[in-house]
Amino acid sequence: MPQRKLGKTGAHRKAMFRNMLTDFFRHGRIETTLPKAKELRSLAEKMITTAKTNDLSSRRKVLKYVKDKEVVKKLFDEIAPRYSERPGGYTRILKMYPRRGDAAEKAIIELVEE
């Protein structure tokens, strides 16, 4: 699957998205740039779909991306069961005003409430 490069090396991009995923599941929403939000949406949707099966293999797959065990517990015990009947579309991206310094498009990505 092609990824957005976002002007970063592979290791930097991977670390950035790991941190963003962890914060996203911890807080339920984060504010970032639009391209990062679009890429994060793809990863978050896959993590929630994986967490819905709730077995050891799924937990290990999610632990590859989300390094905080408390956040993984929250994902499996609170977030995934909330979307058990929903086939997809767990997140929403809301566009915001451009950033003042460099006019980068900003966005809020958040979990959809059932």
From Swiss-Prot:
InterPro entries: Ribosomal_bL17, Ribosomal_bL17_CS, Ribosomal_bL17_sf. Belongs to the bacterial ribosomal protein bL17 family. The keyword Ribosomal protein applies. GO terms for biological process: translation. Transmembrane segments: none annotated. It comes from the Bacteria. One of its GO terms (cellular component) is cytosolic large ribosomal subunit. GO terms for molecular function: structural constituent of ribosome. PANTHER family: LARGE RIBOSOMAL SUBUNIT PROTEIN BL17M, RIBOSOMAL PROTEIN L17. It comes from Halothermothrix orenii (strain H 168 / OCM 544 / DSM 9562). Part of the 50S ribosomal subunit. Contacts protein L32. The lineage of its organism: Bacteria, Bacillati, Bacillota, Clostridia, Halanaerobiales. This is Large ribosomal subunit protein bL17. It holds the Pfam family Ribosomal_L17. Keywords: Ribonucleoprotein, Ribosomal protein.
